[in-house]
Design a protein with these regions (language model features):
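N-terminal and secondary-structure boundary signal
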Residues: 1-103
Length: 103
């Protein structure tokens, strides 16, 4: 079994530049990932925790949209998913097709 690459990006911004923002750091990470296994129109699950009831420990839509855009740029057809219960009330937390860029 080969070792997986682990990427680390500090949440410390330290600079007042756009390239130091968390969104820019995620974009840099996505540029280093290998999306070559995605073929045109492949369905690609973006598996995440969408929250439950009053929980708020979820990934902001701002970041999800960047991941979705990277999958689309590779030719894939992304969709956000979680367990069935969480999917039903995902819109209440802001996870919609319009905000995420995919179903």
């Amino acid at each position: 079994m080969t070792k997986s690459k682990v990427y680390f990006g500090s949440i410390q911004q330290g600079q007042a530049h756009g390239f130091a923002s968390l969104g820019a750091k995620l974009d840099t990470l996505l540029e280093h990932l290998d999306f070559s296994s995605i073929e045109k129109n492949d369905k690609v699950a973006v598996k995440m925790h969408l929250g439950f009831h009053d929980g708020y420990q979820t990934v902001p839509v701002f970041f999800v949209r960047r991941i979705v855009n990277a999958v689309k740029a590779a030719g894939g057809w992304p969709f956000v998913t979680d367990n069935p219960t969480a999917v039903y009330n995902a819109a209440e937390r802001g996870y919609t097709q319009e905000t995420c860029g995919c179903p």
